[in-house]
């Protein structure tokens, strides 16, 4: 056997093998590799997009939370104002009612005072007349001396 012929046969077999691989094996491998690279690239792009969407969603959620807190604070403030208004209105109404009751009580006291004063004047004038009758031992004619009695009542 000749080494050159063997080497030449092996070289031809290798060339045929390389040509066969380049023609039938290499294109599907390249297609699979490119497809895999594309899938990985798309996955990374989607991951980046998802990360950005997540950040955006978190920012929106944070903004909504801030708005809700502000709105809650406003509602609480309005409720406190309304409560204060109701309390002030109740205080004002109670003060008005108190003043009315005091005025009514003072009016009743004044009426009772005037009534008692008038009763006292009448009793004092009756006692004065009785005392005067006993002192001078004679009866005073009420109709004739009504001037004296009226002056006496007015002085008391």
Curated annotation (Swiss-Prot):
One of its GO terms (molecular function) is proton-transporting ATPase activity, rotational mechanism. Disulfide bonds: none annotated. It is found in: Cell inner membrane. SUPFAM superfamilies: F1F0 ATP synthase subunit B, membrane domain. One of its GO terms (cellular component) is plasma membrane. It is a single-pass membrane protein. Keywords: ATP synthesis, Cell inner membrane, Cell membrane, CF(0), Hydrogen ion transport, Ion transport, Membrane, Transmembrane, Transmembrane helix, Transport. Pfam families: ATP-synt_B (PF00430). The chain crosses the membrane at residues 11-31. NCBIfam families: ATP_synt_b, PRK05759.1-2, PRK05759.1-4. F-type ATPases have 2 components, F(1) - the catalytic core - and F(0) - the membrane proton channel. F(1) has five subunits: alpha(3), beta(3), gamma(1), delta(1), epsilon(1). F(0) has three main subunits: a(1), b(2) and c(10-14). The alpha and beta chains form an alternating ring which encloses part of the gamma chain. F(1) is attached to F(0) by a central stalk formed by the gamma and epsilon chains, while a peripheral stalk is formed by the delta and b chains. HAMAP family: ATP_synth_b_bprime. Belongs to the ATPase B chain family. F(1)F(0) ATP synthase produces ATP from ADP in the presence of a proton or sodium gradient. F-type ATPases consist of two structural domains, F(1) containing the extramembraneous catalytic core and F(0) containing the membrane proton channel, linked together by a central stalk and a peripheral stalk. During catalysis, ATP synthesis in the catalytic domain of F(1) is coupled via a rotary mechanism of the central stalk subunits to proton translocation. This is ATP synthase subunit b. The gene is atpF.
């Amino acid at each position: 056997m000749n080494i050159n012929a063997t080497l030449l046969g092996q070289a031809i077999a290798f060339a045929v093998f390389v040509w066969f691989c380049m023609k039938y094996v290499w294109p599907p491998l390249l297609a699979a590799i490119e497809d895999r690279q594309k899938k990985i690239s798309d996955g990374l792009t989607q991951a980046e997009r998802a990360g950005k969407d997540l950040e955006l969603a978190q920012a929106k959620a944070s903004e909504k939370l801030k708005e809700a807190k502000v709105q809650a604070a406003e509602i609480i403030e309005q409720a406190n104002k309304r409560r204060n208004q109701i309390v002030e209105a109740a205080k004002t109404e109670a003060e008005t009612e108190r003043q009315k009751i005091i005025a009514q009580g003072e009016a009743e006291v004044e009426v009772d005072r005037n009534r008692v004063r008038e009763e006292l004047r009448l009793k004092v004038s009756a006692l004065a007349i009785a005392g005067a009758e006993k002192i001078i031992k004679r009866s005073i004619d009420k109709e004739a001396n009504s001037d004296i009695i009226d002056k006496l009542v007015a002085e008391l």
